Amino acid sequence: GGDWSEIALATYKRLPEVAKASDIHQMMINVCLDKEEISYSRIAARLEQASLRKNMERLLGVGDRNSFKDIYFAMLDKGVWDKGTMPAYNPLWESWYEEIYPNRLEYWQIVQWGDKYAIRKEGVPVETPHIGCMGIGLGLHGDTQDAFDLAKALVEGKVNLPTPALNGIRKGDFDTISCCIITGGDTV
């Protein structure tokens, strides 16, 4: 869906005379979102995901299509994930990652991930949602089927965790408090 020629022309018309690659990229996203059509919103989602991938490649030296082993060790070696929290690498995780990777997220989900939940390095997010969700599952459940089940459910939007869990588990932070009010209709 979406007409790339139309996006390119509309982007070109909106750009100032001098623009950086990042300006062009953001303008393409804006053009897509201004269409207010799901097919263009999904193109914007791919562009937003590309920004996260570029951050990973630039700051961690690994992309989201590398083996999960390469991704995992880059996250540990660059201090993005906590070595004391993460279990020892298991080759089985390659199939887990390949299973969750094809899940396409909507634009708002990718933006929310990048803004609120992705771990940052030098002030920019350096995890795609899929990689971060694998880290959350592994950090919380270790090398178990529960880790995969949680990662998959998170990517598919079937489970929601409080922000401290989404932010902290991969870094070894299990002490952050999240507040919520739950009412059950009782008088206690």
Annotate the PLM regions.
Residues G1-V188:
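Extended catalytic cores of very large enzyme megasubunits
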